[in-house]
Amino acid sequence: MPLTDFEGHGTYDPAEDYFPASPWESFHDLTENASFDLGGVVITAYSCPGHTKGSMVFLIDEEDGDKYLLTGDAANSFTFLYQNYSTSVEEFEDSLKALKEKVDGKYNKILNSHGTGVEKMGLLESLIKICEEIKAGKTAEVPFFYNGSSGLIACQPESENLNGNIVFHPERIWKKDTIIS
């Protein structure tokens, strides 16, 4: 995808409609462990490929003691992995395990970009377990259709105590099946 476009939940939008018209040279790459001190709030970036190859998660550490993990689309109660620009389930599982190792015990609330904006604690562990179940062929595989694309929902959406879910493509479970490079 060209840098002048970005994916907006199934539609490609001209980036200039959403970002300032600064020259690209003035932007800096966001990298793993990049940290920003905003005066009382420190934000640290972590890579979490899955929903997209460039998905990032942010640890927000406020001086009052609140610590948040902002997962956005990278990991939430209904994570999309079925699109062509998503990684395989196996790669997503690796990303989640690496992220968990880096941030475990460093946050007390999970924020995302959908629904109420708040996730239950234990989300990363639940998504890792769902990845394992997908790889083992032990999921509900409920058909899912959105915006001309289709995938399979791993767990029955009405399942009790469900903490996270994944929509995946059955032909992109293993690393070797990833389309993006």
Question: What do these predicted regions represent?
Answer:
Residues L81-S86, G122-L123:
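Short, solvent-exposed loop/turn segments at secondary-structure boundaries
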Residues D94-S181:
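Accessory terminal helices/loops
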Residues E32-E63:
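Core dinuclear metal-dependent hydrolase active-site scaffold
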Residues V57-N76:
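Conserved beta-strand hairpin/beta-sheet module of binuclear metal-dependent hydrolase folds
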Residues T87-S95:
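Soluble or luminal CAZymes and related metallo-dependent hydrolases
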Residues V41, D66-Y68, K109:
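Structural motif
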Residues G50-T52, G72-A74, L81, S113-T116:
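Active-site metal-binding loops of divalent metal-dependent hydrolases
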Residues M1-D37, D66, S77, E133:
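Active-site HxH/HxHxD metal-binding segment of metal-dependent hydrolases
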